[in-house]
């Protein structure tokens, strides 16, 4: 075939997270039976980046590498490009093209708005004036990645009637969920919707569920509602379709900026190669 696709998931210590990504890839393949879609993971899997690149390279002379990742932090900017560079050396006759990550987009915003609607429906008195919203991201040492969470939260505020839409992170950076909830309670919110900004399940989703239960006990006067991670939403498939189709002709302007970037080497020399 003309090209093959390598879908790169993050990987999770929780086996179900990787199972969901495999199932997602099978559904995407069903949408496009003429494509060859392979899956690998950055970590916590038997099939990691090098094995994924080698497998895809055996199937065609053009491989489109698609990161199934919301925010461009260390894995997207550093780790995948590093392994991609090595794959090009191992397979000099194969053209590898690195697609853009998902990022903040109108499609992702649509998913987040639906999640908010569903969480509001679980609240006894769904009044946006008294219901705070917290968009809960993974957290990164990369300010641009954290900024994407802030951007999507701002977009959500722009398109809803909620007076208070905050961001929080499960790790690496701040504010954390508990601090964001404390702030909203002090500002008079009697109901709080927490929206995980995650694609699939994993250990962090499990941690969020425990934090949610703890918050309910700490603030019995507040009605909390927890949204689901994004999962198998049609907008995710549509975004990946766009990533592939814009690269079929290998147009430079649609490639991931970090592929071949000389600043990546500088960052590696300063010890910033593997960070979320």
Please annotate each region the language model reported.
Residues 1-276:
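Active-site-proximal alpha-helix that buttresses catalytic centers in soluble enzyme cores
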